[in-house]
Amino acid sequence: MITKTSKNAARLKRHARVRAKLSGTAERPRLNVFRSNKHIYAQIIDDVNGVTLASASTLDKDLNVESTGDTSAATKVGELVAKRAAEKGISDVVFDRGGYLYHGRVKALADAAREAGLKF
């Protein structure tokens, strides 16, 4: 019998715990991060209306990256999501790291979004 829980199951439990307390509004939407082994995705979500206001990922055609699974790609995604948020008039967000550790690609995306003008 396998008793060890997977890393993703533990991440999902952490994410659910945080999401019970954290919610995005129209005035201050939620910046959600999802990372896979090959790509990273960022969405700005209004949870009250259930609408995605802006998004960016390493799969975007606007983003010209050679490697999609490293911190430099995450930095470019952070800059792009902040630019798209600014176009929609969004400056303040709540950061939702998605149960991931604030380290590596997640930290690179957050720092780039902050430098590009998002406040959190």
Swiss-Prot record:
This is one of the proteins that bind and probably mediate the attachment of the 5S RNA into the large ribosomal subunit, where it forms part of the central protuberance. Required for correct processing of both the 5' and 3' ends of 5S rRNA precursor, which is does in conjunction with ribonuclease M5 (RNase M5, rnmV). Possibly folds the 5S rRNA precursor into the correct conformation, thus acting as a chaperone. This is Large ribosomal subunit protein uL18. CDD domains: Ribosomal_L18_L5e. Belongs to the universal ribosomal protein uL18 family. One of its GO terms (biological process) is translation. InterPro entries: Ribosomal_uL18_bac-type, Ribosomal_uL18_bac/euk. It comes from the Bacteria. Keywords: Chaperone, Ribonucleoprotein, Ribosomal protein, RNA-binding, rRNA processing, rRNA-binding. Part of the 50S ribosomal subunit. Part of the 5S rRNA/L5/L18/L25 subcomplex. Contacts the 23S rRNA and 5S rRNA. Required for catalysis of RNase M5. GO terms for cellular component: cytosolic large ribosomal subunit. SUPFAM superfamilies: Translational machinery components. GO terms for molecular function: 5S rRNA binding; structural constituent of ribosome. Gene3D superfamilies: 3.30.420.100.
